[in-house]
Amino acid sequence: MASLIYRQLLGNSYAVDLSDETQEIGASRNQNVTVNPGPFAQTNYAPVSWGPGEVRDSTTVEPLLDGPYQPTTFNPPVDYWMLLAPTDRGVVVEGTNNTNRWLAIILVEPDVPTEERTYTLFGQQAQITVANDSQLKWKFIVVSKQTLDGAYAQYGPLLSATKLYAVMKHSGRIYTYSGETPNATTAYYSTTNYDTVNMKAYCHFYIIPRTQESKCTEYINTGLPPIQNTRNVIPVSITSRDIQYTRAQVNEDILISKASLWKEMQYNRDIIIRFQIANSIVKSGGLGYKWSEISFKPANYQYSYIRDDEEVTSATTCSVNGVNEFSYSGGSLPTDFAVSKYEVIKENSFVYVDYWDDSQAFRNMVYVRSLAANLNSVMCTGGDFSFALPVGHYPVMTGGAVTLHSAGVTLSTQFTDFVSLNSLRFRFSLSVEEPPFSIIRTRVSGLYGLPATKPNNSQEYYEIAGRFSLISLVPSNDDYQTPIMNSVTVRQDLERQLSELRDEFNSLSQQIAMSQLIDLALLPLDMFSMFSGIKSTIDAAKSMVTNVMKKFKKSSLANSVSTLTNSLSDAASSVSRSSSIRSIGSTASAWTDVSITASDVSTATNSIATQTSTISKRLRLKEMATQTDGMNFDDISAEMLKTKIDKSTQITADTLPEMITEASEKFIPNRTYRIINNDEVFETSIDGKYFAYRVDTFEEIPFDVQKFADLVTDSPVISAIIDFKTLKKLNDNYGITKEQAFNLLRSDPKVLREFINQNNPIIKNRIENLIMQCRL
């Protein structure tokens, strides 16, 4: 039988683990190898000395604590704290806008009774009454007046054990600190023309950006880091902040080393990455209430931007990996809204963006080292997608958000319609963000991640700014370009090939002769006969079989086998613990998931549909375990796959694992299975439809779900190649004997061939329908 190929792939999956283990052992071993490159013209090895190179950044990193600076008069920048560190009592700092605000800070030592002191403020003598009741802490006092000749008033004192104070200009105000350490907080004074206020500091001070205000508060309450209190820290003039430091250029081409034929070039580039996240939405047939698949797919995007006064043409390809599959079913009725599968990317997912531009850096990107990149993060939010139903209110999938964080960069290859491009692949890890996504008018709500329904949220693209640096081995002659095929590090992107191959496979369905299909489906098909039609198979047969099994191991069919094995083990354990007849019979739940309560007479129709649908999804495995002489769906599926592989002009050893795995999951999605009990037949489909009828009259009888569940354990499962509706139509129009009916029920290939050779339109239409379901 042709379905032997699927059983072999399932039975030999252990070889995948062995292969992976062997590769891991080989990768973990280190071996020193000395290579003698020989004459330069007769070797592919680089005749250069691989130096460490350098990675320079165009981004200025602002220090957290800038200073200390010498006492001076200057206009502090807005949104920067001026952290003052006086060593003795007296005036600490004073500032004015020369209009309506004169403000100064005075420091008073501990344990000072109320007394009047004379201070020089803004060039004039002023009598200020001060006091400090604290025995240990110093006291900062804010004195302020609103006219040049006005009297000073005192505000917001700060009792400090650290002897530190801070002021800042921000949003039309002058901010200070008040209270008592270690619980000091900020206070402010409204000031016009606040940005023109000059400060005169009488002590050493530091500058801290407002973005680090929490750190400034920490210093005020707990003191400066110990390193700032050593004699080696020497204050400098504030004018040192005005020194123009040389920053890295937006475009840099640096010569690292050079020989007669080769040279090492370091390329540093500021880049802007724009990308789109594409999706595919497939609606099921029928009345228009079902969607079969909503998934992500790779997307190419071409754009241009200005870099260093030069227009750069760029191209990106965005793809995702590690998607999470969700589904929703509103019920079993044809008019119930349902989505069989929709994909969501979450924390366990990755987004890949392949980037290329027309600069010199990408011209010879073949032998590369010291590859590094720094990129910003970007948030991707989901938009609203309405499921257009024929009647009723539309369900709407809305919300969902993730943030992309840079997680690495490698070399890759982008495939466009006309050319292959060496490019950089930027890998992004994900973190989920608010809001969660939901499907309005359904029970789906509060789920986190980004669904594939509308990942761009009406935006044309997402944008990330960053910089990359690499050292590339290039020919010394700038006019020569290293051939792209020499690269051994690029990743061959198969998605474009697979898309074309799927289209070819689907078009080949119409070229397969129905009369030959049954004969070919009965032939034993093993792995090597399956691969015999592919070029260069003999040389790569072993590795190709391993690759096929490695991919097949992750298929839904293989996962179902693993789940079923665990269920059977649990069921066997329950039998050993209890000797009752009911417990032994309950082992059927391993195949069916039907509980003991399923025998309740009052079981609702919807409940039966759900149970029979659950059973049907596992009957494929049961049929594989109890092979009969009849033909089954997997025989047709495997033979269709084999025939299409032989006829295909695009299949390769790289795309074969994908095609076999997809075919095992997607060929003939609408399957119906039956169990024969004397003259009664039980028939169920994976979409929840069920029939029970007598063979002699084809009259329906009540469907006993518990009896059906019990029969699953002991009776062979048969693929309903000719389903109940087709049988009834055949009997009503042509009339068939009881023997013919039994043979068709058992999917006897001889009887099927006879009806096809007689050009029976009903049987031919059913087989043609199965052939057309063999699509990707």
From Swiss-Prot:
InterPro entries per the UniProt record, alphabetical: ConA-like_dom_sf (IPR013320), Rota_A_VP4 (IPR042546), Rota_VP4_MID (IPR035330), Rota_VP4_MID_sf (IPR038017), VP4_concanavalin-like (IPR000416), VP4_helical (IPR035329)
Residue positions of motif KID motif: 644-646
One GO process term, biological-process aspect: virion attachment to host cell
Region (Spike foot), start-end ranges: 510-776
Cystine pairings recorded for this chain: C203-C216, C318-C380
Keyword Cytoplasm: no
Pfam families: Rota_VP4_MID (PF17477), VP4_haemagglut (PF00426), VP4_helical (PF17478)
Renumbered ranges of motif YGL motif: 448-450
SUPFAM superfamilies for this protein: Concanavalin A-like lectins/glucanases, VP4 membrane interaction domain
Marked site: Binding to sialic acid: R101, S190
Ranges in a coiled coil: 484-511
Signal peptide: none
Region Hydrophobic: start-end pairs: 389-409
Record-marked site positions (Cleavage): R231, N232, R241, D242, R247, A248
Keywords: Capsid protein, Coiled coil, Disulfide bond, Hemagglutinin, Host cell membrane, Host cytoplasm, Host cytoskeleton, Host endoplasmic reticulum, Host membrane, Host-virus interaction, Membrane, Outer capsid protein, Viral attachment to host cell, Viral penetration into host cytoplasm, Viral penetration via permeabilization of host membrane, Virion, Virus entry into host cell
HAMAP family: Rota_A_VP4, Rota_VP4
Name this protein carries in UniProt: Outer capsid protein VP4
Organism whose genome encodes this protein: Rotavirus A (isolate RVA/Equine/United Kingdom/L338/1988/G13P12[18])
